[in-house]
Amino acid sequence: MSKEGSLDAPIRHPIDFEHPDFLNPEKLDAEMRRAFDICHGCRRCFNLCDSFPKLFDMIDESENEDVESLKSEQFEPVVDACTLCDMCFMTKCPYVPPHDFDLDFPHLMLRYRTAQKKLGKLPGVPTQLAQIDRNAKIGVMFSKLVNWASDIKNKFLRKILEIVVGIDKRVQLPKYNSETFSNFFKKNKDKINFETPNKNRKVVIYTTCFVNFNKKNTGVAALKVLKKNGVEVQEAYPGCCGMPFLEQADLPKVVEQAKKVSKDLLEWVDKGYKVITLTASCGLMLKFEWPLLLPKDENIQRLSSNVMDIDEYVVDIANNEGLAEGLQEIDGGVTVHNACHARAQNMGIKSRDMLKFIPNVKLDVVERCAGHGGTFGVMKDTHDLANKVGRPTARQIKNKNNKYMASDCPLAGKHLKQLEIDTNISNDEALHPIELMAKSYKL
């Protein structure tokens, strides 16, 4: 007998993308219609991403106002509007497994997108942008030139970039580091020493592509805070976690990255190290998406149980041995943006829990999607839609009237800060929560 949903913890089934039925056109179409019919009868998710308003409008405007009246080609705009944020699955849908309806909307969109990719229907530019390691190595090597050419103030070159590549000229693109965090770590790890008693804790920072190539300061802050708290720190970056490939439905490539990266990280796990991630999306991949794509790979399963988010890890220190003394007040309140891929990890709001240890800090939390969704927020075809989704979130942040905004997702933070600038809120850079901890420690 079926029972009302949202009463049990949601579970996710493995993504069996190699099964013949996964890309079977008839079975995929039938599953899309089944899912859409359930969504049509519920509509609890109407105020999330634009996939649902598009779906409901199409149904309401159809001949018989039902899913069966829709043509299969009408499904594509619904799929295209999904950013794989997972918020419908994690926070809204009452029919996710273990409910009998067994609905996982984001992974169904991923399945449909995989079928599109097989048919050559996905645009080529985002697929090339997903080659993070290749692209970013060039970006770091020629960082001054690339940062100048891609700057939003360089209107001539940005217009050319928009015409040729399709990247919206209005988007503030991430800047490249002049050196990778990996190189910084090798040169400076022994110089950063606070003579703190060792806590018998060992971690390896999985740097993540964004920190390694674009936001070194986050890695530096994490290194200093961990060392301040008596943690032995190592660093590893064998390659990107594969999230950009997941967004482009290149599942074999995600699996390839998972096997490559996990092999390196497991060597540290076998030596007693915990793996620490510095961005929410990468933590989600290592903890959840990799095990779903490779459910029979014992190494992947073992790695996932030894991965922690940096905020999660610092809170764990605080709850056990206690944090090192020296945290001081910071000059202004903090609005924490609890990013979608942090929420999808089901670990609570660890960024807020960590920042609570800053003396007398004013903390506010905004739990709403930024709308960026990887390349979704930068491409001309989808940038306006990303702004539509993110603008209410930026408005909430504005209304909190705090000096700092912190997010575990660097792209979400960048996107929201640009929306803030557009509404004359602030020109300050969005920070990772660990950077505020370093600031409080005066590191």
Report residues per predicted region.
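Non-heme iron-sulfur electron-transfer modules
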Residues: 4-21, 47-83, 95-125, 425-436
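Asp/Glu-centered strand-loop micro-motifs enriched in Gly/Pro and often flanked by an aromatic residue
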Residues: 16-40, 67-70
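A structural signal for alpha-helical segments
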Residues: 27, 70-73, 100, 298, ...
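Short, glycine/acidic-rich beta->alpha junctions
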Residues: 27-31, 74, 256-257, 389
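Cysteine-centered iron-sulfur cluster-binding motifs in ferredoxin-type domains/subunits
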Residues: 33-52, 74-100, 112, 136-139, ...
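A generic structural-conservation signal
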Residues: 48, 58, 91-92, 235, ...
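Iron-sulfur cluster-binding electron-transfer modules in prokaryotic oxidoreductases
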Residues: 103-443
